[in-house]
Regions:
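Conserved acetyl-CoA-binding loop-helix of GNAT-fold acetyltransferases
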Residues: 93-106, 129-133
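Conserved catalytic-core motifs of GNAT/GCN5-like acyltransferases
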Residues: 67-70, 117-120, 132, 137-154, ...
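A short beta-loop-alpha structural element at the N-terminal edge
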Residues: 4-18
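Glycine-rich phosphate/pyrophosphate-binding loop shared by adenosine-nucleotide-utilizing enzymes
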Residues: 3, 61-65, 153
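Helix-loop element at the rim of GNAT/NAT acetyltransferase active sites that forms part
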Residues: 17-35
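Conserved beta-strand-loop-alpha-helix junction that forms the acyl-donor binding cleft
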Residues: 92, 118-128
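Conserved GNAT acetyl-CoA-binding A-motif
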Residues: 108-120
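Acetyl-CoA-dependent GNAT
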Residues: 29, 33-90, 101-102, 107, ...
């Protein structure tokens, strides 16, 4: 499958939130437990260009999204971003996550980001595998740091060194 990767638009917000909402309700890939509206039209419009939200379209329908966010708001962290990728559960295994993550890494490079961080629940083997395949390496693990769905979860920290930013 060759998805169209493009910047998210305000009218995409309901679909982005619906995709995310599926995982809030039934998955440990996000540790959010309550009904969450990750995006708003206003918030999406105000995002810095350096921290995009991208969507993957197939046949004109959004089937996944990915974003870059500041890893930490303190100024010394300005060269580090965190990525998130969520795929419509009906479209797993079709290369959408890889396409979105590749596009996010390209945008990070062009935006002066030096490292991209991913925080992944230790039981999410597909996500861990995707990030490894895209050149990320595990740099830390917080054991039993989160609790969801009746169980304690590890948080795996992975990084991709882009080595491009200069202060």
């Amino acid at each position: 499958m060759n998805p169209l990767i493009r910047a998210a638009r305000p009218e995409d917000v309901p679909t982005l939130n619906a995709i995310y909402g599926h995982y809030v309700e039934g998955c440990t890939c996000t540790w959010e437990e309550a009904d969450a509206r990750l995006f708003s039209r206003e918030g999406l419009a105000r995002r810095e260009e350096r921290y995009p939200v991208l969507v993957a379209e197939i046949g004109g329908e959004i089937r996944g999204w990915g974003s870059l966010s500041p890893y930490n708001l303190r100024s010394g962290w300005r060269f580090v971003a965190e990525n998130s990728v969520f795929i419509d559960h009906r479209f797993h295994g079709k290369g959408l996550g890889k396409a979105l993550l590749a596009a996010l890494l390209d945008r990070a490079r062009s935006g002066g980001v030096r490292k991209v961080i991913a925080r992944i629940s230790g039981d999410q083997l597909a996500s861990l595998g995707l990030h490894r395949a895209m050149g990320y390496r595990e740099v830390g693990r917080l054991r039993e740091a989160g609790f969801k769905s009746g169980k304690w979860l590890d948080c795996v920290y992975m990084e991709r060194d882009l080595g491009t930013a200069q202060p």
